């Protein structure tokens, strides 16, 4: 039997899902209280995992179901994952608390419970992206984030909000298509979806020189897909409209959590799927450096 602390990642995810389902049956004020209590509980649970992993000095895997790796699915929790989960929980709590007054002005009372349902689903999906050890599971919950993010934008009445939501949805679907295509290509050349298996297979392919061109192409598609979803340069122009049209709490969640969740997934894939040596061999780091410099110059020139 696993120690209780190793069950916390799964408990945290299901807590958000169940909290969202409970909000479906509650009035606006009760749904707000439940969401805030859920966020506070997540802060405590994430702090427990962080303390445990720091003192243990190692991460742990949580096997989902009866099938072990590489056939089953699993979660992975270490100090970095626990710290990010703690930060996400705190930001979500502060966003809902800070934007509570504006929600009363921007959203009709009969729709506010729906708002808290969507924020709970976004919260759960972000935790899955942090903890998952499976790249396809990350893709599935990225789409849940997309649907939840569109909902918390569109729930504010107004034509401008609907236009911004449609732009957000269209660009997110383009990014999702590129990401799914790259994941299917990666599965085709490696035969794995779990990150440890992908890391070993990619290292072998890089060492033997096999599938170098497909590996380079799928990496570019993956970066482009996630870059579009998190509005990295040069795919940034569509995002400000969505943030400006949303309510205060939604804008805070989108900019402080959703975008950062995609960026964390990019870093996670680079480190735990490719590794620094393979990235250097494929010149991915050089391309990222060039794009970063151009983004810096573009941002500097656009500020005037």
Region spans (language model):
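Amphipathic repeat-derived elements
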Residues: 14-16, 43-44, 144-146, 228-234
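Transmembrane helix-loop-helix hairpins at membrane boundaries of multipass inner-membrane proteins
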Residues: 1-11, 18, 22-117, 196-203
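Short linear sequence elements within intrinsically disordered, low-complexity coil regions
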Residues: 65-67, 72, 144, 173, ...
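Residue-level recognition of transmembrane alpha-helices
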Residues: 12-16, 35-38, 88, 119, ...
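Cytoplasmic juxtamembrane interface segments
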Residues: 14-29, 147-163
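Alpha-helical transmembrane segments and their immediate interhelical/interface regions
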Residues: 1-21, 129-149, 212-220
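Hydrophobic transmembrane alpha-helices and their helix-loop junctions in integral membrane proteins
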Residues: 94-104, 121-136, 148-304
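Short acidic-aromatic active-site loops that bind/stabilize oxyanions
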Residues: 84, 114-115, 143, 287-291
């Amino acid at each position: 039997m696993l120690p209780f602390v190793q069950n916390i990642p799964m408990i945290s995810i299901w807590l958000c899902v169940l909290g969202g389902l409970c909000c479906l049956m509650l009035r606006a004020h009760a749904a707000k209280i439940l969401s805030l209590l859920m966020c506070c509980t997540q802060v405590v649970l994430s702090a427990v995992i962080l303390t445990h992993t720091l003192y243990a000095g190692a991460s742990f895997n949580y096997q989902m179901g009866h099938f072990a790796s590489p056939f089953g699915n699993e979660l992975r929790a270490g100090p970095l994952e626990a710290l990010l989960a703690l930060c996400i929980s705190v930001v979500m709590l502060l966003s809902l608390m800070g934007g509570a007054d504006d929600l009363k002005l921007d959203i009709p009372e009969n729709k506010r419970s729906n708002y808290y349902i969507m924020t709970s689903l976004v919260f759960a999906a972000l935790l899955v992206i942090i903890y998952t050890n499976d790249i396809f599971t990350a893709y599935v919950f990225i789409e849940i984030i997309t649907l939840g993010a569109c909902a918390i934008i569109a729930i504010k009445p107004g034509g401008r909000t609907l236009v911004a939501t449609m732009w957000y949805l269209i660009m997110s679907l383009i990014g999702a298509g590129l990401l799914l295509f790259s994941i299917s290509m990666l599965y085709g050349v490696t035969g794995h979806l779990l990150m440890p298996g992908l890391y070993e297979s990619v290292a072998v392919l890089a060492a033997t020189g096999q599938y170098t061109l497909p590996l380079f192409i799928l990496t570019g598609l993956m970066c482009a897909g996630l870059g579009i979803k998190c509005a990295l340069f040069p795919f940034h122009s569509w995002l400000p409209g969505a943030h400006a049209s949303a309510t205060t709490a939604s804008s805070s969640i989108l900019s402080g959590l959703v975008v950062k969740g995609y960026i964390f997934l990019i870093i996670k894939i680079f480190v735990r799927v490719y590794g620094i040596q393979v990235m250097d061999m494929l010149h991915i780091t050089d391309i990222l450096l060039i794009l970063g410099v151009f983004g810096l110059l573009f941002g500097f020139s656009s500020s005037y």
